[in-house]
């Protein structure tokens, strides 16, 4: 079959019309130094701060130092296979992590990659790890409570949705236990929790995840783990990655709780990177921008205005102190950024007061306006009572004679300390907290032996659940106290039963005092 000349010319014309002159331009540099999680590269004159760069082995890095001759890069992943002379190219993107519902119930690394062995995470949504915090007009005052389930916190230092509340204390004072109990208490509260573990042993994180699974809390929780064995760059970006995951929910009108455990280790990782990148050291060898490191992170937690959906992100950053020194650099920085702090005292912890919240040093600057009416009524004077008890307790060490009023204050104080104790992984619903604190502040516990207080509390809840469930229901629905007469009658009913069955109205402590006086 002969080919016609017209057909050939038509084909050529069509190809010319469809021809596109596409030039693929890549800016490629050369690695001049690599080691300890950082690299330097020459030839990336147009690289931008925070830009994602790709190495020839497939690893990624983030541009940090933009110098006249080279670029300082932190390597996000395996740096041992990168060699001097390797190529590194610009991507024109900033670092992003996968976000969305697919991450709920999973354990991921700071790059959003699954590390729990449950398969791939299928999501098409991504968010940049660094983002602008909401402005003043995009925010709303904190007005909803975020219940932790811990009496010592919900009564003395209440937290609201959208607040930043620092948890600070020495190692082994129960900071992580507060985090886990708070997550457990969010069950059924329409809250998504993100637990960011920074610089912890993988075995410790595994234990926490098992606890969350046991109580059904992984159904609404994402765990981001940057373990102690990970390179410093991953510890540095972990909190930002967790916050980006939380922002996806917050900007869609949902409520998020994010816990950073802990920011001291992130600051140490950032100090390591800064010193390796030859940035000038400042106080305690931290770089000059270590305040900005934490402020730009924590400012992203907010209660959004109704125009933006009314979502919220509540942040609980943890900071570890050395020998209770809260005047060190990182603790003072984070105290000044947050809306209050919960100080955990090691002496209280070892004395058996757990959670070991120091009522004198702990404060919540905005949470009071989010407390429910019932809690405000019963816990209003609790902090002052506790502070005056601690003061009086110090004086009684001298063994001076006490008048009846002082003795009554001491007795009430001992019972207050006892009632604020709580078992591990046993968060209390707010209505139950209100009832037991009401019983305390209205003198129902004054004749109960101190060593029987927690037994009385547990059995009182069982009695009310069975015989007066409407009391709990009223507090839960109205957020206010039921009729005082009804509440007094119910508590007195059970108190009479308790004292009759125990057949003892004096504690061991009171008996010893009577022997000494005799």
Swiss-Prot record:
Main localization of the protein described in the UniProt heading: membrane
Superkingdom, natural source: Bacteria
Membrane topology: Peripheral membrane protein
Site (Required for activity): 362
EC id: 7.1.2.2
Disulfide bonds: none
Top EC category: translocase
Catalysed reaction, written as an equation: ATP + H2O + 4 H(+)(in) = ADP + phosphate + 5 H(+)(out)
Gene Ontology cellular component annotations, sorted alphabetically: plasma membrane; proton-transporting ATP synthase complex
Pfam families: ATP-synt_ab, ATP-synt_ab_C, ATP-synt_ab_N
PROSITE patterns linked: ATPASE_ALPHA_BETA (PS00152)
Localisation per UniProt entry: Cell membrane
Binding positions (ATP): 169-176
Coiled coil: none
Record keywords: ATP synthesis, ATP-binding, Cell membrane, CF(1), Hydrogen ion transport, Ion transport, Membrane, Nucleotide-binding, Translocase, Transport
Family: Belongs to the ATPase alpha/beta chains family.
Subunit: F-type ATPases have 2 components, CF(1) - the catalytic core - and CF(0) - the membrane proton channel. CF(1) has five subunits: alpha(3), beta(3), gamma(1), delta(1), epsilon(1). CF(0) has three main subunits: a(1), b(2) and c(9-12). The alpha and beta chains form an alternating ring which encloses part of the gamma chain. CF(1) is attached to CF(0) by a central stalk formed by the gamma and epsilon chains, while a peripheral stalk is formed by the delta and b chains.
Function: Produces ATP from ADP in the presence of a proton gradient across the membrane. The alpha chain is a regulatory subunit.
Protein name: ATP synthase subunit alpha
Source species of the chain: Enterococcus hirae (strain ATCC 9790 / DSM 20160 / JCM 8729 / LMG 6399 / NBRC 3181 / NCIMB 6459 / NCDO 1258 / NCTC 12367 / WDCM 00089 / R)
The gene coding this protein: atpA
């Amino acid at each position: 079959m002969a080919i016609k000349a017209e057909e050939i010319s038509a084909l050529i014309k069509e190809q010319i019309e469809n021809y596109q002159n596409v030039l693929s331009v890549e800016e490629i540099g050369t690695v001049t130094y690599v080691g300890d999680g950082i690299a330097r590269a020459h030839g990336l004159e147009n690289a931008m701060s925070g830009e994602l760069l790709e190495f020839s082995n497939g690893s990624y890095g983030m541009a940090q130092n933009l110098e006249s001759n080279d670029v300082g890069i932190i390597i996000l992943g395996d740096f041992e296979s990168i060699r001097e002379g390797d190529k590194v190219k610009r991507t024109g993107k900033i670092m992003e992590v996968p976000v969305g519902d697919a991450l709920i119930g999973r354990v991921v690394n700071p790059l959003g990659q699954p590390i729990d062995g449950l398969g791939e995470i299928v999501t098409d949504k991504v968010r940049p790890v660094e983002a602008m915090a909401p402005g003043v007009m995009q925010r709303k005052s904190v007005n909803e409570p975020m219940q932790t389930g811990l009496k010592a916190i919900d009564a003395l230092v209440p937290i609201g949705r959208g607040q930043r509340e620092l948890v600070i204390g020495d190692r082994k004072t129960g900071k992580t236990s507060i985090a886990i109990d708070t997550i457990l208490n969010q069950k059924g509260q329409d809250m998504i929790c993100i637990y960011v573990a920074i610089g912890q042993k993988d075995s410790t994180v595994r234990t926490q995840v098992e606890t969350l699974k046991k109580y059904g809390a992984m159904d609404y929780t994402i765990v981001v783990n940057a373990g102690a064995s990970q390179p410093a760059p991953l510890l540095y970006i972990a909190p930002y990655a967790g916050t980006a995951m939380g922002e996806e929910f917050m900007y869609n009108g949902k409520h998020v709780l994010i816990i950073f455990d802990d920011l001291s280790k992130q600051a140490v990782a950032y100090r390591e990177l800064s010193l390796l990148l030859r940035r000038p050291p400042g106080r305690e060898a931290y770089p000059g921008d270590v305040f900005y490191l934490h402020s730009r992170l924590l400012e992203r937690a907010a209660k959004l205005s109704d125009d933006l959906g009314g979502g919220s992100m509540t942040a609980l950053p943890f900071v570890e102190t050395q020998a209770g020194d809260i005047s060190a650099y990182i603790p003072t920085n984070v105290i000044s950024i947050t809306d209050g702090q919960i100080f955990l005292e090691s002496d209280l912890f070892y004395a058996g007061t757990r959670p070991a919240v120091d009522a004198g040093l702990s404060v919540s600057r905005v949470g009071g306006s989010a407390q429910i009416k019932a809690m405000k009524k019963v816990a209003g004077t609790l902090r002052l009572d506790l502070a005056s008890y601690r003061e009086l307790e110090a004086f009684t060490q001298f063994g001076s004679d006490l008048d009846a009023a002082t003795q009554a204050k001491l007795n009430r104080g001992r019972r207050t300390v006892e009632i604020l104790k709580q078992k591990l992984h046993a968060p209390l619903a707010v209505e139950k907290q209100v009832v037991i604190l009401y019983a305390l502040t209205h003198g129902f516990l004054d004749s109960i032996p101190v060593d029987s207080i927690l037994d009385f509390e547990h059995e009182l809840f069982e009695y009310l659940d069975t015989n007066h469930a409407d009391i709990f229901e009223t507090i839960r629905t109205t957020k206010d106290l039921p009729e005082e007469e009804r509440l007094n009658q119910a508590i007195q009913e059970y108190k009479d039963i308790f004292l009759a069955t125990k057949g003892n109205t004096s504690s061991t402590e009171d008996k010893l005092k009577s022997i000494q006086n005799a």
